[in-house]
Each structure stands twice: as C-alpha cells, then as structure tokens.
Amino acid sequence: MHAWLCENPVGVDALVWKELPTPVPRAGEVLVEIKAASLNFPDLLIVQNKYQMKPPLPFVPGSEFSGIVQELGEGVTHLKPGQRVACLSGTGGFGTHAVVPAQACVLLPDGFAMVDAAAFIMTYATSHHALIDRAALRTGETVLVLGAAGGVGTAAIQIAKAVGARVIAAASTDDKCAMCASLGADATINYSTQNLRESLKALTGGKGPDVIYDPVGGDFAEPVFRSIAWRGRYLVVGFAAGPIPSLPLNLALLKGASIVGVFWGDYARREPASNAAMMVELARWYGEGKIKPVIDSTMPLAELKAAYAHMGTRGVKGKLVMVS
C-alpha cells in the first residue's frame, strides 16, 4: 500500500508519499481499500500539531473516507468483505488502505455514492446533533449559520431546511452566499461587506435568530450573540477563525439564552444508540434527496498537498475529496 505519512507535524510540506506494508486487522478491526477521502478542518490542524488529538508519530492523516471492506479481524460479524462502507477514524484516510475499528464503519446503502459518503459523516452528524439534538430546532424558527459555505455550514443549511426552519446563511463572499441560496437558505449575509448585527436586525424584524450555528468563533461570536432572540440557543461548534472567543455571560442572562457546546465525537461514543438512530435518519434523508454533500472538487490522492493549500485559502465551498 501507499500513504501520505506525517513523521514530523510541522505542516503540510513535511508529508511524504511512502510505500508501507499493508496492515493486518486485529480483533475488532477491518482492512478497508480506500476509494475516496475528504478533507476536514482538523486534518489541516493535525499535521501542524495544533489539533487537540495528537496521534503518535508517524501517522497517516485523513479522518473521513469511504471504501470497500477487504479483510475482517477476529470477532467482526456485522461486516463482510466486499461491502461498501464510510469510515471516521481520526487518522489513516490519506492512503490506499487503512485498518480501522469495525465500529467506526457505517455500511452504505445502495445508491450512496462513494465520493458523497467520504464527505458525509462528520459534517452531517455534527450538524444534525447540533440543530436537532442540542438546539431542539423547531419548524418555523430562524437559524443563523456562520461559515455557511463550508462543509458543516452547507450541511447545517440542508438539515435546518429539512425540518422546516428559516435559514439565514452568512459567508465571506457574494459567490459563497449565492451557493448557500441555491441550497435553500432563505436569506444571506456577506459579512465581508455587510454589518452582521444590522443585517440580522433587518432580516428578523428586530427579533434576532432563535438558533445560532457557529463553527467559526473569533470576532463574529459576540456581535451575533448580542443579536440572539429571547430564549435563543447559541451553538458552539468550532473555531475555524482561530481565536477562541470570550462571551460576556450577562448577555445570556439578559436574553434568557443558552450557550450550548456541540461535541459530536464524544456524543457518538457516550450515546451510541442515539447516534446510530441519527445516522439512519440522515441516510434516509440522503435517499429522499433532502440532503446531499456539496463537493467543491475532487482531486487525485497524489495531489493532497495542493488540496491542503486550497483548503488553507478558505476558498473552499463545501468539501474537498481525494480519490484513489
């Protein structure tokens, strides 16, 4: 097998394409031949030693991928060689093969495209857990999605629309805003040229959004939280802007609002039955055409460094997917 190996986490340029022994699955594991792998923001951080999870060196980056089961480890009974799966394993995806825990594999239904499957689990599970479980989003409520043109943002737009919410999508360019509108966003804000607070006031008749979905953090956090509706729910999804914001807690008191943390990975570990039911619903919505990953582009796995560079420009709309 071949894979991109990180021997020194000082950045993308240190990654090396290497031939490695094909691993043998141990008990509870499966060997997967990888067909497609997507880039997520943690994949950029992990090779810079900036991510909260720091795998032992050397490691193969790539947290989310799809492929075909090749071999089963002892005790694996729910999968068979030849079956198509999507996997979320933290590392291992940017290679031709990977050994992963069997419980990290989701069996793909017929008609689920490999490229879509590689760009599905992390973003859609995060957004569903955030909006449906943590925020208890209701039909008719208004959701503000920050970073709306990114992977989790585009998933959040589609999931919010699937349950009948009104969506305001905020993004950094007119082109990205147009793409969000094409996904069903009812209104858009270009926060590079428009004032967020004034725009939200105008778009909500002064009420503010009921739910704020924030994977960005940074300087946008406080202005949008000041705009939140009474009994609003502010979802802390991530910090793509870099700095972790500090919110004045008196604002939560004055608005009767909730600041809600969203950590889908630990939710899946702690509440596996609920997570499994969520994945079934997401797969059904995909089959019904209610949700579909937005793929910015597909690139050969050999061009991973160029894909990382593109992702680093923040010009990506949806997800980048590497194909073998």
Regions found by a protein language model. Name each.
Residues 84, 142, 166, 232-233, ...:
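Short glycine-centered segments of the SAM/dcSAM-binding site in methyltransferase folds
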Residues 21-38, 50-92:
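Glycine-rich beta-strand-centered segment in the early N-terminal region that forms part
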Residues 80, 118-194:
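Mid-domain Rossmann-like dinucleotide-binding core that forms the NAD(H)/NADP(H) cofactor-binding site
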Residues 195-206:
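Short amphipathic alpha-helix with an adjacent loop that forms part of the alpha/beta core around
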Residues 1, 206, 283, 288-298, ...:
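C-terminal capping/lid region of NAD(P)-dependent oxidoreductase domains
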Residues 36, 45, 84-147, 182:
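NAD(P)H dinucleotide-binding glycine-rich loop of Rossmann-like/cofactor-binding domains
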Residues 93-96, 171-179, 244-249:
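Short, glycine/polar-rich helix-capping loops at beta-to-alpha or helix-loop-helix junctions
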Residues 219-291, 316, 323-324:
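Glycine-rich phosphate-binding loop and adjacent beta-alpha segment
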